[in-house]
Regions:
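A non-catalytic alpha/beta surface segment that caps or lines the substrate-entry region
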Residues: 11-73, 227-229
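Proline/glycine-enriched tight loop/beta-turn segments at coil->beta junctions
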Residues: 72-84
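Acidic/histidine-rich catalytic neighborhood of metal-dependent amide-processing enzymes
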Residues: 94-212, 235-238
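Extracytoplasmic/secreted proteins, especially bacterial periplasmic and envelope-associated proteins
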Residues: 8-11, 15, 29, 33, ...
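N-terminal capping segment at the start of a domain
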Residues: 1-32, 92, 264-272
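Structural recognition of the beta-strand scaffold that forms the well-ordered cores
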Residues: 65, 85-88, 131-134, 165-170, ...
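Active-site-adjacent substrate-binding region
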Residues: 166, 177-304
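Glycine/charged-rich beta-loop-alpha catalytic/anionic-binding loops adjacent to active sites
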Residues: 83-95
Length: 304
């Protein structure tokens, strides 16, 4: 792994939020600059990288994908090579916001995971296919519509008949507080801590089995505080990221989040800047997520 992962994560955050700034069509060239940056960072890890273009209202957009093809050791595990894990994050931000937490943290984590996986797997392959995908157009006015990058991606996977056994949406995941009362919840969600010092794994009912497996694997990595919830999709806030696109295609998917507007006071504002991120907690979180996802992928055969 990068010998200074904290510095690497902070570098990504600063580049996204301060060098590029807000990332949407209102800031000309920002989406292309971000896609190019992500592509270059993926390619530095040695992973196979590609852009997946889609057109919406006569404008081209790009999802950027890094691939780790699966190759099980044993013939009895051959089925695993047909199973895919998708780890994704959106790279756009709302107008007027540099989007350090939403969703610079998701993209910074995605880029760090690519570097981690290149080292963890080394000259071997994961048993399951792993795809790291940076999605365009999660924010309004594209959310849940035909211009949403993750929805285009998930639909294409479904058309191809791909067996996606897990999707993780890395969404607004760098703000933590030890202040009492710093954590809020949508109506109907009760019994959870009121101090916002944990990461949340958010699933729908159909993703409960994946949520339990994720809980078990994450607990083995460290004592990092976390909460899990499997809730109906109409629960306010539960569907508000790219995992929703995979739920629509009946794939199991989980949002990994600091809960965004239920905790983060700078959500969707001009004050969503890198200095708001708890870089120590964020670095520890990304490290633990990397080990969790690698365990789910499994160590397979040597590269051919």
């Amino acid at each position: 792994m990068n010998k200074n992962p904290k510095s690497s994560l902070l570098g990504h955050l600063n580049h996204l939020a301060l060098v590029i700034g807000e990332r949407n069509l209102g800031n000309p060239g920002s989406l292309e600059a971000t896609a190019q940056y992500i592509q270059e960072q993926f390619e530095k890890t040695g992973l196979e990288t590609r852009r997946l273009l889609f057109n919406f209202e006569n404008t081209n957009f790009a999802n950027v994908e890094a691939l780790l093809p699966g190759q099980p050791d044993l013939e009895s595990n051959e089925r695993l090579a047909n199973e895919t894990i998708v780890i994704g994050a959106h790279y756009d931000s709302v107008p007027g916001s540099p989007g350090a937490n939403d969703n610079g943290t998701g993209i910074a984590a995605l880029l760090a995971l690519a570097a981690m996986f290149a080292e963890i797997f080394g000259d071997r392959r994961p048993q399951r296919n792993v795809r790291l995908v940076a999605f365009a157009n999660e924010e309004s006015p594209y959310f849940a519509g035909d211009g949403m990058g993750s929805l285009n991606y998930a639909r294409a996977c479904k058309v191809r008949g791909e067996k996606i056994v897990a999707m993780y949406s890395l969404e607004t995941m760098g703000y933590f507080s030890d202040e009492a009362g710093s954590q809020n919840y949508p109506p109907g969600v009760n019994g959870y801590p009121t101090t916002g010092n944990f990461i949340a794994f958010v699933a729908n009912i159909n993703s409960t089995a994946l949520l339990e497996e994720t809980r078990s694997l994450f607990q083995k990595q460290s004592n990092f505080p976390f909460q899990t919830i499997a809730a109906p999709e109409n629960t306010p806030g539960v569907s508000l990221s790219d995992h929703m696109s995979f739920w629509q295609m009946a794939y199991p998917a989980i949002m990994v989040t600091d809960t965004a507007p239920f905790r983060y006071p700078y959500y969707h504002t001009a004050q969503d800047t890198p200095d708001k991120i708890d870089i120590d907690m964020f670095t520890e979180l990304v490290n633990n997520l990397g080990k969790t996802f690698a365990a789910l992928a499994g160590i397979g055969a040597k590269r051919l």
